[in-house]
Amino acid sequence: MVDSQYYLPNDIGISALDCREAFRLLSPQEKMYAHYLSRASWYGGLVVLLQTSPESANIFVLLQRIFRKETPEELEKVAATVGLSSEEYKAFLVYAAGLYANMGNYKSFGDTKFVPNLPKGITTYFSGNCTLEEAELAQRFLDSKKLSAYNTRLFKRNDGGKVCYEVRLASAETSCGTFTFEDKEFIVKRGDYCPLMEKVCFYLQQAEAYAANENQQKMLEQYRHSFNFGSVESHKEGSRFWIKDKGPIVESYIGFIESYRDPFGSRGEFEGFVAVVNKAMSERFTKLVSSAEVLLSELPWPQEFEKDTFLKPDFTSLDVLTFAGSGIPAGINIPNYDDIRQSEGFKNVSLGNVLAVAYATQKEKLTFLKEEDKDLFIKWKGPSFEVQVGLHELLGHGSGKLFVQDHKGKLNFNKDKVINPETGELVSSWYQGSETWDSKFSTIASSYEECRAECVGLYLCLNKEVLRIFGLEGQDAEDVVYINWLSMVRAGLLGLEFYTPESKNWRQAHMQARFVILRVLLEAGEGLVGLKEVVGHDGKPDAQITLDRTKIHTVGKHAIQRFLCKLQVFKSTADVEGGRALYDGYSSVGDSGANNFLRLRETVLLRKEARKMFVQANTKVNGDHVELVEYESSAAGLIRSFTERFQEDADQLEADLLELSKKDTPCWC
């Protein structure tokens, strides 16, 4: 095990998210709306501390109390007097900044614990004594009660020798009911994260007064009801109003959204974002939406496996003002509720100011590429990623149909006519009743879907019309295609950092997906992709990847076409057995065959670069206007942003966090 895997290096990249100009252009009403939504998001984001690990909330409170008493600069003088070197003190600041940026002491991207150096992982979506089989039992119970797992946690208790399962719903209100299911007792309780949910509801109500239209008002009203009573149905209703709110200047979404970090793949991590539309960049995405129906017909599955109607979504480029949670993505396709996405629509967003800094690369830190590829990679990485994100979100996550039989027995497809292209026979399986993609495919659902969306991006970026939409033609267009595919191949190799050999588990959905794609392209053969182990200039193990750009449109396209069709067919037909066999097969990391991936993993760990952290601005009301408070791009700046973020009720908030953490402690001991 490589020790550095569990530390954040002192030279980690820390960048401020620039939203000054976007915020300046907002009207006074829009600024107030953005401010109160940001406050709701930041308080809700503290839930992630309690979702991440038993100790995260306690460490957060400790750091808040330290830095409220003394600024990072003042504390440095104290540290020097007790013998800490400047590098040691910086390491402390980086650790503190890392805890704030990840909302816990596990990396949000990869779920590796960082300092203290303990390799064994934990999750707080389930109490420490819950097994995977019990998670499956709980899912069956939730399905029977038509409850979604998104905003729940599961706790196993022993009451006088009798096993009892407590399902906690995140809400401001408390109480619910007791049920018997499969000879086991289940207690459903409201009130998880109660004081934090109260804060979220308070600020959402404040934001309502500054809503631009009725859709926004009704959306916030439903969100408040959801967070008050733990109702996923209310959150779904709010999401419907959110979809109808076309082209807002201030865009936001909040709730228990992504299930990447739940070991069972059903429970959502809290996140909330507030962002401002970048009109110039959004024009390109609008053109992509206009071409979507034509492009969807080019995807490699039969028409019956595509949605009956493509509901044209909003697709905008946003500059993030606030993103509260454990990490900031480059793009989002939401809501995640399949029933809404299939019949009512969704929205896509690309986070422009995140892209601008997250993927800036220094040549000397570019690993595993040939020297002649590095300058081209640096030049076209940004534009190629913009194309990939657009296709991934809109036509990746936005494509494909799920075959469903509802509670009344009605099917959304003709089971007597639809042929499975993989078997040549009639479709023989589908989703029934309350079954969803997440509940059915559970542990592989997130990564499998990310892989499908990434493959759509690779496949459709070969289309010249797509490239023209992004202003790319001729040699520039070909270079962007090459770098997009090369970037995916490299990302597949880098993904090995997020594989744990001891448990044979992947810790990050996107990186597992990219490794799977690397395996598919290597398997295609014919010299399309090369991967070899070499010795670096420093005399240490290294690796080099190559991609034959002359074979992307032939060998590469055919390989992705076949694989993508299989992914979609297994997903559409709820064929968990077939889908898992396919995906687990390509996800396996071994030391035999043409490539020793276990040894390559050690090389990747040796040469890995830490993921960047972001410093976000705060907003504060001064009289009748809202001010933007910005911070420097450093660990100290990131720390200051958090200590100033919760100044007004710091003592009560910290007491609430400690009480919530204490309440859960018996479940982990």
Task: Describe the residue ranges of each PLM region.
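Amphipathic heptad-repeat coiled-coil/leucine-zipper-like oligomerization helices
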Residues: P54-V163, V167, R519-K571, R580
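Extended, compositionally biased alpha-helical segments that mediate assembly or anchoring
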Residues: K540-C669
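Post-HEXXH active-site segment of zinc metalloproteases
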Residues: G400-E449
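Short, glycine/acidic-rich hinge or "gate" loops at secondary-structure transitions
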Residues: E214-E221, H235, D406-N412, V466-L486, ...
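Active-site recognition of the HExxH zinc-binding catalytic motif
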Residues: S27, N213, F385-K408, E425, ...
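Contiguous, non-catalytic segments that form substrate-binding/exosite surfaces or channel walls
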Residues: E88-C176, E182-F385
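Long, well-structured alpha-helical subdomains associated
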Residues: C19, V48, W437-K440, I444-C451, ...
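N-terminal-proximal low-complexity accessory segments that begin disordered
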Residues: V2-R68
